[in-house]
């Protein structure tokens, strides 16, 4: 009886199949009657192997598609890196802009304020201008100067300012007060009590609240001077520094 077994091996993308052929002993001896041929007796078990080789056909891939995949890999990686770097740069720029813009605006406002208030110096050889003897601070069309060394009474201060073609400072607005405070100007100002209605009046008839209740105090403290952000009443005969104002 003939039996067959198959064993499969794979090497170098090839499938090799071995077929085992087995013959068994036969009780009958087969002889070939011809004289010329030698008798063949199958007495022993004989094994014969036949080798069958099958070639596996690889599936063809488009060459362009394979090359395209190889080329797309590095490019996509580079684009991702570039995109990430640009995103991080945008975040940094937005953060920096948000921090610097408020500082820039505040510095510009401060610079504009300082340019509107700047010391005025006249030429040294100009003897006709008495205002050039000291530094005057300009604010719009007004110029201010504080005389701290030679203290005078309120009347003497007003006369000294008139000799310079100016007058004691007249405060017309809150902004003017803030500018005087910025340069720390203290001294007599043109602010005097009106004896008719016992109210405090500016030179331009702008009223302020009466701070003195006693009539004797009103008469003795009828003059005003500026100290910091306060308007202090005092005796007009007291000697203090004074602030002159010159209008263009």
From Swiss-Prot:
Source species, domain of life: Eukaryota
Stretches that traverse the bilayer: 81-101
Q: Residues on the Extracellular side?
A: 102-248
- The record's disulfide annotation reads 132-145, 161-244, 223-236
One example of the protein's molecular function in GO is: carbohydrate binding
CDD domains linked to this entry: CLECT_NK_receptors_like
A Gene Ontology cellular-component term: plasma membrane
Q: Which residues are glycosylated?
A: 197, 214, 220
- Does the record carry Transmembrane helix as a key word? yes
Instruction: Please indicate the residue ranges that the annotation assigns to the motif ITIM motif 2.
Output: 47-52
Show which residues sit on the Cytoplasmic side of the membrane: 1-80
Q: How does it sit in the membrane?
A: Single-pass type II membrane protein
Query: Where in the cell is the protein located?
Result: Cell membrane
Annotated Gene3D superfamilies: Mannose-Binding Protein A, subunit A
Q: Where is the C-type lectin domain?
A: 139-245
InterPro entries per UniProt: C-type_lectin-like (IPR001304), C-type_lectin-like/link_sf (IPR016186), CTDL_fold (IPR016187), NKG2/CD94_NK_receptors (IPR050919), NKR-like_CTLD (IPR033992)
Keywords noted in UniProt: Cell membrane, Disulfide bond, Glycoprotein, Lectin, Membrane, Signal-anchor, Transmembrane, Transmembrane helix
Q: Does the keyword DNA repair apply?
A: no
Q: Where is this motif: ITIM motif 1?
A: 16-21
Summarize the protein's role: Lectin-like receptor for natural killer (NK) cells. Heterodimer formation with KLRE1 mediates inhibition of NK cell cytolytic activity.
| PANTHER family, sorted | C-TYPE LECTIN PROTEINS, KILLER CELL LECTIN-LIKE RECEPTOR SUBFAMILY I MEMBER 1
Q: How does it assemble?
A: Heterodimer with KLRE1. Interacts with PTPN6.
Designated name of the protein: Killer cell lectin-like receptor subfamily I member 1
Species in which this protein is naturally found: Mus musculus
Question: Taxonomic classification, please?
Answer: Eukaryota, Metazoa, Chordata, Craniata, Vertebrata
């Amino acid at each position: 009886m003939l039996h067959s077994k198959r064993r499969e091996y794979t090497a170098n993308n090839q499938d090799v199949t071995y077929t085992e052929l087995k013959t068994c002993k036969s009780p009958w001896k087969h002889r070939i009657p011809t004289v010329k041929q030698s008798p063949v007796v199958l007495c022993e078990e004989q094994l014969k192997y036949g080798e069958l080789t099958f070639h596996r056909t690889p599936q063809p891939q488009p060459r362009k598609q394979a090359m395209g995949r190889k080329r797309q890999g590095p490019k996509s990686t580079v684009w991702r890196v570039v995109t990430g770097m640009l995103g991080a740069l945008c975040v940094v720029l937005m953060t920096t802009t948000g921090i610097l813009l408020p500082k820039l605006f505040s510095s510009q406002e401060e610079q504009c304020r300082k340019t509107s208030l700047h010391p005025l110096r006249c030429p040294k050889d100009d003897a006709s201008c008495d205002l050039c003897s000291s530094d005057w601070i300009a604010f719009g069309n007004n110029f201010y100067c504080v005389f701290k060394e030679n203290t005078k009474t309120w009347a003497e201060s007003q006369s000294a300012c008139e000799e310079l073609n100016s007058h004691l400072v007249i405060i017309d607005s809150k902004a003017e007060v803030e500018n005087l405070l910025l340069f720390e100007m203290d001294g007599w100002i043109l602010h005097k009590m009106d004896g008719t209605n016992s109210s405090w009046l500016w030179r331009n008839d702008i009223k302020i609240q009466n701070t003195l209740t006693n009539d004797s105090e009103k008469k003795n403290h009828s003059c005003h001077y500026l100290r910091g952000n306060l308007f202090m009443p005092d005796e007009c005969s007291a000697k203090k520094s004074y602030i002159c104002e010159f209008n263009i």
